[in-house]
Amino acid sequence: MTPFDPAPGLIAPDFEQLSLHLPARCLFAFLSEARIERFAREKGGTPLGRFASITKSFPIYELQTPDGPIALMQAPVGAPAAVLMEERLYAYGAEKILAIGCCGALTDLPENAFLPVMKAFREEGTSFHYQEAGDWILFDEAPRLRIEAWMKEKGIPCSHAVTWTSDGFFRETKEKIKARRRAGCNVVDMEAAALAACARFRGKEFAQILFTADTLSSLSHDQRGWGYHGRNAALEIGLAAARVM
């Protein structure tokens, strides 16, 4: 592995020089485009613009709340793609991002449990471009505590996620799962460590809520309902939680 280099990159996240000014807070959702579009329409959201990539274009909406405007955008799956869009959100005005999406359970967690992330085990590659090498990245405590307090106030069951961020969806082996559980991980995802590392590098505030979908707790795979009910609730919970960031 090459040493971490904190020098500026030669390509800036705002290289396109878009006429786009985002609200300070953003909800970054690992959910389908159709679900996000429907939610934005139901909330009276306003289209702000789009971020283009080689494979697709990502619409950005502005939702009005009693605590001010919040941007809403679909997050692409996988650490490199997710951070590519996170960087652009920061470049065009976002100061605080709340990511929300599903995860796999490694321990005996029920399906559709919503878990604010406390820390992530770094077994992807993207975070190492943004922080010195190390096994873990701790998430910002202040926004997590505000989100947890809000969840408790609303009666939403709340416990921490200690997540294993992996690039290898089909390489979650029995021995790796055992090792990650011994280290304290209770869920697995594909982006959290990288998103937190990017936010810290850019000096921005970041939090993430994961909801449980499938499970590997028995050292075999049970897809359960793939977090279907969690997906239905995620945008409402995410928007409300973003208001307290």
Task: Set out the residue ranges of the language-model regions.
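His/Asp/Glu-rich mid-to-C-terminal helical/loop segments that flank catalytic regions of hydrolases
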Residues: L216-M245
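Generic non-transmembrane alpha-helical segments
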Residues: R146-K154, C198, I237-M245
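Zn-dependent metallopeptidase/amidohydrolase metal-coordination segment
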Residues: A193-G227
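Short acidic/polar active-site loop segments enriched in Thr and Asp
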Residues: E95-K96, N186, E205
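Metabolite-binding pocket within alpha/beta catalytic cores that recognizes anionic/polar moieties
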Residues: M1-R146
